[in-house]
Regions:
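Hydrophobic alpha-helical transmembrane segments of multi-pass membrane transport proteins
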Residues: 56-61, 77-149, 174, 178, ...
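Alpha-helical transmembrane segments and their short interhelical loops
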Residues: 120-195, 255-276
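Short hydrophobic, aromatic-rich alpha-helical segments embedded in or entering the lipid bilayer
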Residues: 2-8, 24-31, 204-249, 258
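Residue-level recognition of transmembrane alpha-helices
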Residues: 32, 50-51, 81, 85, ...
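Junction motif at the cytosolic side of a transmembrane helix
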Residues: 2-14, 239, 243, 251-285
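Short helix-capping/hinge motifs at transmembrane helix termini and TM-loop junctions
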Residues: 61-70, 92, 149-154, 158, ...
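Aromatic- and glycine-rich beta-strand/loop motifs that create alpha-glucan
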Residues: 6, 12-53
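Transmembrane helix segments
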Residues: 63-68, 182-229
Length: 285
């Protein structure tokens, strides 16, 4: 259905001598985003990583890990871990962007798009926007399950929404990075394997599940400079949840919100152009 819409749009452009414009590119992005959302509706199991996984992770870490976890000052582990679970679920689910692009390239779908005078980058932008909407669903699931297991934010609604916004911005930035992995891989399975090797340590070598206070010094440095730690700490601060800090922390530890925004913007600035370059190279004869 989306291919037909693109064909109709392309034909109308040719008849009126259409020149590329921002409005036309935006329309291409909307069509490509809708195409990805339609695929999800036809195969709802694609949403398991943003619906089922958050529920399992929340129950597992709150009731299993939380039963033996002691935080400084006797803070609630549930309140501590929910922002970490939010970030971790968004990080692990971001690999769907790379796998989806690798799938489209391997099954010839992108070759069909090349026959149309559409904005080529709309394939990438549409994919990342659709995955951003999936990430928003994941955030909502984490919040609902968190409330069910006893998590409560300590700040006003606007601050809480800002926390979700920071997490979603990082998720969108990471989607561009995983898009590069998908474009470098020759098969979806390869993209998944490589992505797992990158995403797994990124998610777990951080303060998402445990404070970095008692980690070995060399590991604590890595965890403190991990962008996942900055995002998680900033979300905790915006939510008004416990965020134990070392007495003498590094710059990202002392300024988590600034570090999270810098990491996100820098990742988009680097990964988006690189993904566009890789896409042109993969789709140019």
């Amino acid at each position: 259905m989306s291919t037909v819409e693109l064909a109709i749009t392309a034909a109308s452009r040719e008849r009126v001598g259409f020149l590329p414009s921002l409005a036309a590119r935006a329309k291409d992005v909307v069509v490509m985003t809708r195409r990805n959302l339609v695929h999800i509706l036809r195969e709802p199991m694609q949403l398991s990583d943003v619906t089922v996984q958050p529920v399992l992770f929340t129950v597992l870490f709150v009731y299993v890990f939380g039963s033996g976890m002691s935080l400084p000052g006797g803070a609630s582990y549930t309140a501590f871990v929910l922002p970490g679970l939010l970030t971790m679920n968004l990080v692990t689910s971001s690999m769907g962007t790379g796998v989806g692009l690798a799938q489209d390239l391997s099954n010839g779908m992108v070759e069909r798009f090349r026959t149309l005078p559409m904005w080529r980058a709309s394939v990438l932008v549409g994919r990342t926007v659709a995955d951003l909407l999936s990430a928003a669903v994941c955030s909502a699931v984490v919040a609902v399950v968190g409330l069910a297991v006893g998590w409560r934010p300590g700040h006003a609604l606007l601050s809480v929404l800002a926390g979700f916004g920071v997490a979603l911005l990082f998720s969108y930035a990471l989607a561009w990075a995983t898009a590069c992995i998908g474009l470098l891989a020759k098969e979806p399975e390869s993209a998944m394997s490589v992505g797992f090797v990158v995403i797994f340590p990124l998610a777990f070598v951080s303060n998402a599940l445990v404070p970095t206070l008692h980690m070995p010094s060399w590991l604590r440095v890595i965890a403190d400079w991990n962008p996942v730690s900055s995002v998680t700490a900033s979300v905790r601060d915006l939510f008004g949840n416990p965020n134990p800090l070392p007495l003498h922390g590094s710059w990202p530890v002392e300024h988590p919100l600034g570090a999270a925004l810098i990491w996100s913007v820098a990742l988009i600035a680097v990964a988006a152009p690189f993904a566009s370059f890789l896409f042109r190279r993969r789709t140019t004869d």
